[in-house]
């Protein structure tokens, strides 16, 4: 070895304790050398494909399909492999089979006249496609992706060339045997799932899994089974995380939003949250109130008048409770500087008015049966009892707690990954574009240090159960992250929920965005953020969600000359009339960056029966002349460190600083 000679042998001696531990795993020169060769080979493989999705908002059907088709990657692979040798309808059917193998096979078995021939043709096609998508990985990594039932057979087929004369008979006999013993369906399902798994090496979810859609819990259940995933929390995720931690204000917000969009399936069916106490409370206190301004906003939901009336009453009841609970946090935490959101004490019930910023506004709803004008932020006895019951439901929901732990273990406020900076909302800025300083826990923080601190506090809210004071502060901070003026997730000066319910004047409904959004198209701002997060400004991108891109109005998701990319997924149906599309996703493969825009998705049923896919158009943002390799990634940096350590171990063996283990002992 030339890396370590007599002049720098002290480096090895300084690391001798660690190297002795490493020698337990690689007990000989032979085993250490083999591992170096293996790792060096991995460095030269093409970089794995990354898939970026944002702002799912509980729309599980669209998301499930996007996950299965990898934003069009599978279709592009089919085109690459089969080109003009397959008709478009055959390509479409093959793609649908890979996305939904079980359901598609059920249909094919009913319609296909010569099923054995179809099996044979399809198996050849799937194996060929799988050979291509697995070619950028080591055999070891591919092997780990294979289902145990078919692992050996799939590995044999992937590594044999069916066009070689001496192997063709062997290759054909395997496929014929699979069909003869009636295992073709199971094999097709298995290899389709392998293709889905291998086509994307890393999945990034840039926030807002939760919100108004009906299936957030279905989405998280699917994500928890994904082989490699990270999540950057969104504002809607953080409010659910706060609710699961026991933050009463977050619980009230979660329930209010669910009632606002008549989406109770996630709460009741998904997580078993009992809303009957709230319904009883609402009927008792708002029986004669039509709660006109609290009628749920329904899209594609057929609700009868009785349901609408009940949901409206529940909606108003929890909203008033929310304002009371939020008032307590604001008073408890003067450092949040949110006193202007204390509005209940500004209500004149007798006059039916609100004093907002020294201006008097007429209230459009003056029925406040639970409001004590002397102590407007105090819960009455019935409200306190209700809040305790709801909190117990959230804390004791096994599935909710499991899902939130998954968000904590796989998530963070931001992520640096392969020279890209991923975050959901914004980096708080001043009006002049400089980083905004925020004081928390007697510390003045900005930029990266602010996000790091907020990330730690969010974890304390959930995990510091034996430290009530720290846990309470963390829970209050979770609520602040949801709606606070300097929250990197919210990104606005204030949340005007009260004004939207109780005031007609639309000017009071406005929510001023953080200056970050004014500077998003500014390359200097992006460079400043890259420097703050210790990234190379020439080779990095900010990948952002949160604010839907209004493509319909000509807005471009590519900001600051390609340095900042906004990929709000547009899954939320309510935003699609404004955006004109169903949003964007991003693919980062060994050839570069691909931004894909998507049309609205019809349904999984139509995708299976009619072969309907999400219509997408792809823009090549960056294309490299030589493919990026594992060498160029964060994983590559880690592998280089491993190689460095193993090289030190080799020198330690050769210099006699560590003794090799006897070959016989190694084997037996």
UniProtKB/Swiss-Prot annotation:
GO BP annotations of the record are: gluconeogenesis
Q: InterPro entries from the entry?
A: FBPtase_class3, Metallo-depent_PP-like
Q: Name one Pfam family in it.
A: FBPase_2
Q: In which pathway does it act?
A: Carbohydrate biosynthesis; gluconeogenesis
Name of the top EC class for this enzyme: hydrolase
* Gene designation: fbp
Instruction: Please verify whether the record's keywords include Hydrolase.
Output: yes
Originating species = Clostridium botulinum (strain 657 / Type Ba4)
Entry keyword Cell inner membrane: no
Which EC number(s) does the record attach to this protein?
Answer: 3.1.3.11
Q: What is this protein called?
A: Fructose-1,6-bisphosphatase class 3
Question: Which GO molecular function entries does the Swiss-Prot or TrEMBL record give?
Answer: fructose 1,6-bisphosphate 1-phosphatase activity
């Amino acid at each position: 070895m030339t890396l370590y000679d007599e002049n720098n042998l002290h480096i090895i001696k300084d690391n001798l304790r660690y190297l002795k531990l490493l020698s337990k795993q690689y007990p000989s020169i032979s085993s250490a050398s083999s591992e170096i060769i293996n790792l060096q080979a991995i460095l030269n493989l093409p970089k794995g494909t990354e898939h970026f999705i944002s702002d799912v908002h509980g729309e599980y059907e669209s998301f499930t399909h996007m996950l299965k088709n990898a934003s069009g990657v599978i279709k592009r692979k089919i085109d690459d492999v089969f080109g003009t040798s397959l008709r478009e309808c055959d390509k479409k059917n093959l793609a649908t089979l890979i996305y939904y193998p079980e359901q598609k096979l059920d249909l094919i078995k009913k319609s296909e006249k010569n099923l054995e021939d179809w099996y044979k043709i399809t198996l050849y096609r799937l194996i060929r496609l799988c050979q291509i998508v697995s070619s950028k990985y080591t055999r070891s990594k591919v092997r780990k992706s294979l289902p145990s039932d078919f692992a050996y057979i799939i590995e044999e087929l992937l590594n044999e060339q069916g066009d070689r004369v001496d192997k063709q008979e062997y290759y054909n006999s395997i496929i014929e045997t699979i069909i003869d013993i009636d295992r073709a369906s199971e094999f097709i399902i298995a290899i389709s799932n392998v293709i889905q798994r291998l086509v994307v090496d890393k999945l990034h979810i840039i926030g807002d899994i939760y919100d108004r859609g009906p299936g957030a819990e279905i989405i998280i259940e699917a994500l928890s089974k994904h082989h490699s995933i990270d999540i950057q929390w969104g504002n809607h995720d953080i409010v659910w995380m706060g609710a699961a931690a026991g933050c009463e204000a977050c619980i009230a917000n979660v329930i209010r939003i669910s009632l606002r969009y008549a989406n109770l399936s996630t709460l009741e069916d998904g997580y078993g949250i009992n809303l009957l106490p709230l319904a009883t409370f609402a009927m008792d206190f708002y029986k004669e109130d039509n709660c006109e301004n609290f009628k749920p906003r329904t899209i594609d939901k057929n609700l009868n008048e009785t349901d609408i009336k009940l949901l409206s009453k529940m909606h108003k009841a929890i909203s008033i409770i929310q304002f009371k609970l939020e008032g307590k946090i604001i008073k408890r935490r003067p450092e949040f500087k949110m006193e202007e959101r204390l509005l209940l004490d500004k209500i004149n019930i007798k006059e039916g008015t609100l004093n907002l910023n020294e201006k008097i506004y007429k209230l459009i709803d003056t029925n406040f049966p639970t409001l004590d004008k002397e102590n407007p932020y105090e819960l009455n006895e019935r409200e306190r009892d209700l809040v305790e019951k709801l909190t117990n439901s959230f804390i004791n929901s096994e599935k909710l707690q499991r899902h939130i732990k998954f968000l904590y273990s796989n998530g963070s406020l931001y992520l640096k990954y392969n020279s890209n900076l991923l975050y959901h909302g914004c980096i708080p800025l001043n009006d002049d574009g400089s980083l905004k300083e925020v004081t928390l826990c007697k510390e003045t923080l900005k930029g990266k240090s602010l996000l790091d601190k907020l990330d730690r506090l969010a974890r304390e809210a959930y995990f510091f159960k034996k430290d009530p004071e720290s846990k309470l502060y963390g829970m209050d901070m979770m609520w602040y992250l949801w709606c606070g003026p300097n929250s990197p997730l919210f990104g606005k000066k204030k949340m005007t929920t009260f004004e939207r319910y109780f005031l007609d004047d639309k000017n009071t409904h406005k929510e001023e965005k953080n200056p970050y959004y004014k500077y998003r198209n500014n390359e200097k701002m992006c460079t400043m953020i890259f420097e703050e997060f210790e990234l190379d400004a020439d080779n990095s991108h900010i990948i952002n969600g949160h604010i839907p891109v209004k493509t319909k109005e000509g807005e471009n998701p590519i900001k600051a000359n390609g340095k900042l990319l906004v990929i709000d997924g547009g899954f939320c149906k309510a935003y699609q009339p404004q955006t004109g599309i169903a949003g964007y996703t991003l693919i980062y493969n060994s050839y570069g960056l691909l931004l894909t825009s998507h049309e609205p998705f019809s349904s999984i049923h139509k995708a299976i029966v009619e072969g309907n896919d999400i219509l997408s158009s792809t823009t090549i943002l960056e294309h490299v002349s030589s493919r990026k390799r594992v060498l160029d990634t964060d994983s590559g940096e880690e592998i280089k460190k491993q190689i460095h350590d193993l090289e030190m171990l080799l020198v330690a063996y050769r210099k006699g600083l560590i003794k090799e283990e006897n070959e016989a002992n190694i084997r037996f």
